[in-house]
């Protein structure tokens, strides 16, 4: 089945994924592709339910001679087009307008005046001036600007320093804005994008999870047939939902391999086995490889070295178990859409690696198995929605993100069994208190009010006093952040009473720790994880 779809061409903006998420929130399927695709690719999309095209922003300058150009077919297909920031400038330049370098750059909050009545902005305003002008609170991020309209266009929005902050050719359904409607700082942005895809593009909103489950199950059955499938189950959201979906489609043809590297959270192995093996009847091979991983990590203090060791050992253990399943023809992975986008970005040189990612991407070549990725079209929030639809426990589906190397990157320096045991218990206390403490204003638990929370083990000792005696024990740091997209994050303002309870419990219940600190660093400049 071809869903109605919106094609998003990415020119390197850091927030392009947010465009796709906003479109999907409007009930419309969207796909992101690099902005340098050719005309043939764009025309081919027309036969696959294409209803409109969105051109993303970019850190590059449309004014530069070597800047990427929008494929000409975009403006020839007869479908509505929305240009955002760089996308607006490229649209203007290629359709006969003028783009100029601006001495006055706009970065951050701005107030934009809407002009005339266009289908995109009509009736949308955050406030009205005494003169009766509708004003929009938006987020700008540009240096260049459009200084002359292409033929057939009219001004749709303006600011004092950017007279053409939006333009429209409503005969051809071409719209463009200099600001970013995809970010939350643009108050009416979600409404603008929903209006573009639903009213201007005429999409019917045929993208929903119940239909997706039925389609995905049918697709897996057709793809796999009677073959057997193996999947590396980590207990994380992505692999868990992938396992549940594949099991729903092919039942006992699926075998999961659960590798316990000794760096999981408290009782995580038991919970995974109970949920999948006991409650859902999934075939699982449970491998306790704690000694193997700890042995290889001994003496290693460098974060990147630890990540690579854990990734390599996981591949080795998984490979050994998979080799015993002679009839398996497919390797399933919990790859999700952001992974696909980031991989494409890396291939085109648009992505920069901050940390190596722990996954099983190298396995298909070594095992000679075909790859099955049933979640590769979904964003994380959609994966969670799918998990609930498949009957997974909400506590598992809405669990905070957990790194593939596990506690290995939450123990600073060398990983030791003693450190992992102390950290596991301290982390469990922190999470328990977050879940049980309700914020009176929102009525939600502080676990639900934070995007990610965990404890970090610091391999340093501090002096303390317990009873009449002096102690010299380890330090634990607590980290809790709030974020919308994990690209930026603020430290969570946890109540002092909550922090006091967590500190008291850890110091009293976890022998070996006598000091607890709270991390108040935002991202950037800090990252969310410490390593």
Swiss-Prot record:
Domain of life: Bacteria
Span of domain GMPS ATP-PPase: 207-399
EC number: 6.3.5.2
Keywords from the named record: ATP-binding, Glutamine amidotransferase, GMP biosynthesis, Ligase, Nucleotide-binding, Purine biosynthesis
Entry's Gene Ontology cellular component terms: cytosol
Active-site residues from the entry: 85, 180, 182
Gene Ontology MF term list: ATP binding; GMP synthase activity
Catalytic activity: XMP + L-glutamine + ATP + H2O = GMP + L-glutamate + AMP + diphosphate + 2 H(+)
Keyword Nucleotide-binding (UniProt): yes
Positions that bind ATP: 234-240
Boundaries of every Glutamine amidotransferase type-1 domain copy: 5-206
Keyword match ATP-binding: yes
Pathway annotation: Purine metabolism; GMP biosynthesis; GMP from XMP (L-Gln route): step 1/1
InterPro entries recorded: Class_I_gatase-like, GATASE, GMP_synth_C, GMP_synth_GATase, GMP_synthase, GMPS_ATP_PPase_dom, NAD/GMP_synthase, Rossmann-like_a/b/a_fold
Disulphide bond pairs: none
Gene3D superfamilies listed in its UniProt record: 3.30.300.10, 3.40.50.880, HUPs
CDD domains linked: GATase1_GMP_Synthase, GMP_synthase_C
Broad class of enzyme this protein falls into: ligase
Subunit structure: Homodimer.
Function: Catalyzes the synthesis of GMP from XMP.
UniProt-listed HAMAP family: GMP_synthase
Record-given protein name: GMP synthase [glutamine-hydrolyzing]
Organism: Bordetella petrii (strain ATCC BAA-461 / DSM 12804 / CCUG 43448)
